[in-house]
From Swiss-Prot:
Glycans are attached at residues 42, 150, 267. GO terms for biological process: symbiont-mediated suppression of host innate immune response; symbiont-mediated suppression of host type I interferon-mediated signaling pathway; type II interferon-mediated signaling pathway. The lineage of its organism: Viruses, Varidnaviria, Bamfordvirae, Nucleocytoviricota, Pokkesviricetes. This is Soluble interferon gamma receptor OPG193. Induction: Expressed in the early phase of the viral replicative cycle. InterPro entries: CR4_N, FN3_sf, IFN_gamma_rc_D2_pox/mammal, Ig-like_fold. GO terms for molecular function: cytokine receptor activity; receptor decoy activity. The gene is OPG193.
């Protein structure tokens, strides 16, 4: 009688054995499978071109499982197999190079005495305790990203896009220097060229307000010179004593005249 009961239980389990949902996702080559199904399963993986299956997990219930260490070649397809008794099901993946998603870069702004540095750190894969930048590595599909940085200055709501040249990049990240006296905010996005067509999410926005050690005034044409002269006159009056004010005011007047003359000459050259 006991044998009949055992056989009946095994028969019932085999009837209900079924994978009801399955999902594979790889972000920065951190690869996971998520699945639901009744009972416990043995899970194995086979790469294209290799006959044998690699056992990944034994007698495990539904859930999310890391399989990052098992696909041996990032450029070929592979299969994930679930087994419970006589029930078997295989799930196909076109390969990590096609399926992998790349996360956003990390953006840092650093102020120096005479400039601000924008540093864009490449997204990275985690291998054990090591963080390995995703940049022109054969074991990561030779992926490298070309970045676009969106700058916003002062109170402006319209971003100014700037494409980062790959010559400004190393194996760890990209670096450019720029100058502004206004508050600046930056966010960056990476994208690949070619058939893989990877596009990252935008990075978190970072902002920096420079220390105002320099007074500035934009001059685009000679019509802007009076505004420049008025602004600098206020600076002279508020920052310097009367003896210095007299000298600096004369210097400001002659400088303003020289700038006006120079801009007028440029304008004549432009239309000649």
């Amino acid at each position: 009688m006991r044998y009949i009961i055992i056989l009946a239980v095994l028969f019932i389990n085999s009837i209900h054995a079924k994978i009801t949902s399955y999902k594979f996702e790889s972000v920065n080559f951190d690869s996971k499978i998520e699945w639901t199904g009744d009972g416990l399963y043995n899970i194995s993986l086979k790469n294209y071109g290799i006959k044998t299956w690699q056992t990944m997990y034994t007698n495990v219930p539904e859930g999310t499982y890391d399989i990052s260490a098992f696909p041996k070649n990032d450029f070929v397809s592979f299969w994930v197999k679930f087994e419970q008794g006589d029930y078997k099901v295989e799930e196909y993946c076109t390969g990590l190079c096609v399926e992998v998603k790349i996360g956003p870069p990390t953006v840092t702004l650093t102020e120096y005495d005479d400039h601000i540095n924008l540093y864009i750190e490449h997204p990275y894969a985690t291998r054990g305790s090591k963080k390995i930048p995703i940049y022109k590595r054969g074991d990561m599909c030779d992926i490298y990203l070309l970045y676009t940085a969106n700058f916003t200055f002062g109170d402006s709501k319209e971003p100014v896009p700037y494409d980062i040249d790959d010559y400004d990049c190393t194996s760890t990240g990209c670096s450019i220097d720029f100058v502004t006296t206004e508050k600046v905010c930056v966010t960056a996005q990476g994208a690949t060229e070619g058939f893989l067509e990877k596009i990252t999410p935008w990075s978190s926005k970072v902002c920096l307000t420079p220390k105002k050690s320099v007074y500035t005034c934009a001059i685009r044409s000679k019509e802007d010179v009076p505004n420049f002269k008025d602004k600098m006159a206020r600076v002279i009056k508020r920052k310097f004593n009367k003896q210095s004010q007299s000298y600096l005011t004369k210097f400001l007047g002659s400088t303003s005249n020289d700038v006006t003359t120079f801009l007028s000459m440029l304008n004549l050259t432009k239309y000649s």
